[in-house]
Amino acid sequence: MKIDRLRRRREKRASHGRIGLGRVILMALLVLGTVLGVALATSYQSVTADLPDIDEMQPVGLGQNSRIYDRNGKILGYIAGVTNRTEIPLARIPVDLREATVAIEDKRFYEHGGVDWVRIVGAAVRNAMDSGGLRQGGSTITMQLVKNLYDPDAPRDFSQKIREAHLAQEVERRFTKDQILAKYLNGVFYGQNSVGVQAASLTYFDKPVWAINLPQAALLAGLPQAPSAYNPFVNPKDATTRRNVVLQEMADQGHITQAEADEAKASDLLLKRGRTYERKREGYFFDYVRQELIDRYGEQRVQNGGLAVRTTIDPRLQRAAEQAIAGNLGQEGDPAAAVVLIDARTGYIRAMATSREYGKDSQFNYAAQARRQPGSTFKTFVLTRAIADGINPYSTVYDSRPIDINDPRWGPIQVATYSNSYRGAVPISQATLASDNTVYIQMTLDVGPERVVDIAKKMGVQSDLPVVPSIGLGSGEVTPLEMAAAYAPLANGGFRVKPIAMTDLGTGIPKGDLATPKRTRVFQDGVAYEVTRILRDNVTSGTGGAANIAPNVAGKTGTTDDYTDAWFVGYTPR
């Protein structure tokens, strides 16, 4: 009996002791909570007192890749930037990805007003008990959005969390939950230079985000917390573990069933390294457009401005140009070749092709960058100058003979024909069909080399040209693009047109006179008619016979010494 009473007294004292200890712990927690609450309120007032209204703050421009399209609206490629980003509306983002993101990042997203105070206090307590610095996050999706848009480089301390909390509440008052989620999903970093879900999906799965499945959505949702650590290309095991955590959270929160979660967990990562932001069609033309954009608007605007550039390139004509090259100079060891097609009325570049496949080892654009001597194709400018001066090409006769003179202005001049055959007295028209060098050197001296250069420049040649008698025989260096543009006035009745590669930059972006044809009259249409008449005969019965493939084709061949370069510049009059 005595022993029982002693046992009961000890148990009673122990019970009282446990109750007392519980009360002490409870009181301590209440005191700690009160202190933290007061401290939080005081800090909140202190930090937010001088904060500007969010409308007065300038959000960071996230930017996105500019895109280049052909004339029909089919994409040629993306212009690479420091990061890749393509903004899309929330409706194109799968529900699975939205729910996965909310489940792992902010499960009370649809319940709070921008700040999850329970989560923040919990994070503060854990970090206070873990020697100071803020290592465990209490940020909601809205707070993360605020940081990304307004304070991306701010320090990660408690004051900054309060600042983000205040601004997050302002954001919640101005935008709907769907708008906030869309901004977040389009602006968060997913690793591999990818910002936003579309860039991430194209990078990790090589498909647009609206085409991904549940396990892929869960993988993406898990990346923002630590993009490098969970990079599936580098750390597939950790990425799988993180993905499965996301899937389990989705199941626990009722977004999917446990069976769906288990099935998705059993799935492979389903990775496919995407090259969307690297791939490009018509690489030489693409680079030509990119450089022109940079020259006009600067590299930063071009890389991150989200331009949607509609170009002038015509896929059908581009294929025809490529096939023409491949059918004639497509074998290994063949010389390099280039073709440029320009609409003579507008200057729109419809095709730009070369014989070299575009790639890492070949990015030199023979069509726009290769300066070569044009040979006899330059005789057209001498002919145009002469006709514009009133010389009749049918009645004006020159002596076709070897030239070996010592000109008082230009010094010794020696010129022969390629075949070393001469016709004696011959009208200019016939000398053109025979591409007679001896006649054209005399014509160049008569009209003046400087005036040949002048008419060539006015018609569209932009390269520096030597003012020498041999300029009439093509001793200067020009690009195929320049020559195509310079022949355009002969096809359109006497108007110089500037080559145009782009017609539009996208909605809301002023394009100025970007696509407006720049037509400047350089000679009367009668001059164009007479030159064309002779160059048409040159195709039907002169040196340009190989180009006689359609009615009304006019043009001129050109060959340099030792056949180093061979040209044909032609057109159909409009």
Predicted segments — roles?
Residues Y110-I120, V195-Q198, T257-E260, K360, ...:
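Short, well-structured active-site flanking segments
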